[in-house]
Amino acid sequence: MQTKCFQDLVAWQKAHAFVLAVYQLSSHFPAHELFGLCSQFQRAAVSIPANIAEGYRKLGTADKLLFLNIAQGSLEECRYYVILSRDLGYMDINAYEALAIQLEEVSKVLNGYCRGILNNSHGMNCKSLI
């Protein structure tokens, strides 16, 4: 499927939906977490679709994959924040499971997007970047 802008990417769409869910959830965190976990969680979540968007216009495969790799790192950071938020009692088990499932969907689509870029790179050796 041909894309015209980063918003057409399923990886970006799912990552953006995850950001909205994180903002909704973290708005209920205790006030003392506003500049702690809340801020860190939101920044890491925003980094996922932001880096997908930034990598979208990069011309070289290595450049694209670098930004997608940063997005993957931020995704893993969020995976920890989901666990920490649950363990601190800031979300119930239903919210935890919903967010964990959503995060896993983002991960799978993002990994597929990276594989697609690698497969279209015509043999360039960029596998070390993902």
Set out the residue ranges of the language-model regions.
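Short, C-terminally biased terminal segments at protein or domain edges
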Residues: 1-54, 58-130
